[in-house]
Amino acid sequence: MHTENSVTICGNINQIYAMASAVEQWPRLLPHYRWVHVLSGNATERLVEMAAHRDGFPVRWTARQRLDPVHHRIYFTHVRGISRGMEVTWFLEADGLLVHVRIVHDLTWRWPPIGPLIAHYIIGELFVSNIASKTLRTIKQHIEGHGVS
């Protein structure tokens, strides 16, 4: 399974990076996030338990988050939950007054014969892409000062 979600935000790359990397603040900022608990770690690498919902359907996972502020990258490896093994990378690229933000999710399920289909259509299309799209859209609204609708 491979998904990509992106948005262009008019704002400061460091401010956007700070908001995107502070996952413990997401439930306050992103209505579709139920909770985020930092389980262990330090300023650049930590273990987090995250819970969101996809239009009322609850999902939960645990991931290792690694921050690379110099290159404006955020990495996650899902270590528990149905998405275990998923690799996620946030890419932030400045372009004048704009910042292009892209989230890439990759998951390989080898459960023959339907594992790849479940990974792509159920996990990828129905959940990952939906939640990532809402996350990017809401961060854009906060940064650009439009509030959350």
Task: Please annotate each region the language model reported.
Residues 1-44, 149:
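Hydrophobic ligand-binding cavity/cleft-lining segments
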Residues 2, 43-45, 58-60, 85, ...:
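A general secondary-structure signal for short beta-strands and their flanking turns/coil
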Residues 5-7, 36, 50-52, 61-67, ...:
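Hydrophobic/aromatic beta-strand elements that line small-molecule binding cavities or substrate pockets
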Residues 13, 40-44, 67-71, 91-100, ...:
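A short, structured loop/turn motif at beta-sheet edges
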Residues 15-20, 26, 48, 65, ...:
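Hydrophobic pocket/interface hotspot
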Residues 43-45, 53-58, 66-73, 82:
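Short, charged/polar surface micro-motifs in flexible loops or helix N-caps
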Residues 53-60, 109-115:
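Short, cysteine-centered beta-strand-loop-beta hairpins and adjacent loop/turn segments enriched
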Residues 77-133, 139, 148:
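Beta-strand/loop substructures that line and gate deep hydrophobic ligand-binding cavities in soluble
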